[in-house]
Amino acid sequence: MTTLGTPLSPSATKVMLLGSGELGKEVLIALQRLGVETIAVDRYDNAPGQQVAHHARTIAMSDPDQLKALIEAEKPHLVVPEIEAIATPMLETLEAAGTVRVIPTARAARLTMDREGIRRLAAESLGLPTSPYKFCDSLDELQAAIDGGIGYPCVVKPVMSSSGKGQSKIDGPEGVKAAWDYAMAGGRVSHGRVIVEGFIDFDYEITLLTVRAMGASGQVETQFCAPIGHVQVSGDYVESWQPQPMHPAALETAQRIAQAVTADLGGMGLFGVELFVKGEQVWFSEVSPRPHDTGMVTMATQWQNEFELHARAILGLPVDTTLRSPGASAVIYGGVDAQGVVFDGVDQALSVPQTEVRLFGKPESFVKRRMGVALAYADDVDTARTRAKEAASRVRPRAVG
């Protein structure tokens, strides 16, 4: 039986989120609805999640000393990493000492903090199907990897980045240096290491939200949400929809792959497993041990959205992954580089039938920064996609003055 306390009292159940962007914000809201005392941590002040949490803290989360000091001072019951750029070795140390429980585990946080750890786990340890790949530390190594078998076209990504930053496709020799430079500029940390992957001519790509939660038997059980289809531009999610139609054999394979990788990572919580699909063939791409940006569509489609599923799972509560309605999401970009933007056209966006708008509250806008998302419901996915994109297009961020 799970016992939950009262926030801001000695009995409080305290959860600390490391990373407080738009995904963390929704997790915090879900936790608060269950009476959890929340601590939102980010590298800058007034991050979206900090605006709704009981406590807001700003530190360099990649600094192990700052991270250790904060966790020891706040004494949370759970620490929930929501981004990759965290001093994960310190989390492993604190978890091993019994200081705190890391979600899903400190090992999972370390392995998934960069593309190398998780790719080697999936392909080399678990034997899961992936694209051909090489890791490279220099432009010369990148060229040698391409010439040595990866070939063209191929995709280059920093080993550590988020939301597709630094990712590009190379169609021929003339694009190699530009791809390397772009990867160096887009990485989360300044070490020059990339993964280059052979290009898979897939039909579509999906996110399979996979939940490890306590079952009725008292044991951890794995459940799957309906597959989410999505469109990415330069590795950054632009729109998503649920459900994505799949051949039954492909769905079975996708679930088997997701089960294998999440079981190895262990712990409890929601995982976003990214997969490429061609006919009945499925390839593993990446996994995040936390809610996924493409999964924001579940705020329109599921009885329990991905954030509620994550909150319930990490607290040891039962979950329900049932689909409620077909739906879609479409990103609202900043469009301008400015502080404290205003949003025109929200009324026009909400006049599109069966739509909702979520504005994240980010204090600073960039042209390609995700500032909000439009959600739409419908009887079918195609109609929902049309509605979501139309609603998103009507929201117009602008600089003040």
UniProtKB/Swiss-Prot annotation:
Organism: Cupriavidus necator (strain ATCC 17699 / DSM 428 / KCTC 22496 / NCIMB 10442 / H16 / Stanier 337)
The organism's taxonomic lineage, starting at the top: Bacteria, Pseudomonadati, Pseudomonadota, Betaproteobacteria, Burkholderiales
GO biological process: 'de novo' IMP biosynthetic process
GO terms, molecular function: ATP binding; magnesium ion binding; phosphoribosylglycinamide formyltransferase 2 activity; phosphoribosylglycinamide formyltransferase activity
The ATP-grasp domain, residue ranges: 120-315
Keyword Nucleotidyltransferase applies: no
Gene3D superfamilies from the UniProt entry: 3.40.50.20, ATP-grasp fold, A domain (3.30.1490.20), ATP-grasp fold, B domain (3.30.470.20)
Subunit field text: Homodimer.
Protein name as it appears in the record: Formate-dependent phosphoribosylglycinamide formyltransferase
Keywords: ATP-binding, Ligase, Magnesium, Metal-binding, Nucleotide-binding, Purine biosynthesis
Keyword GTP-binding: no
Broad EC category: ligase
Functional description taken from the UniProt entry: Involved in the de novo purine biosynthesis. Catalyzes the transfer of formate to 5-phospho-ribosyl-glycinamide (GAR), producing 5-phospho-ribosyl-N-formylglycinamide (FGAR). Formate is provided by PurU via hydrolysis of 10-formyl-tetrahydrofolate.
GO cellular component, one term: cytosol
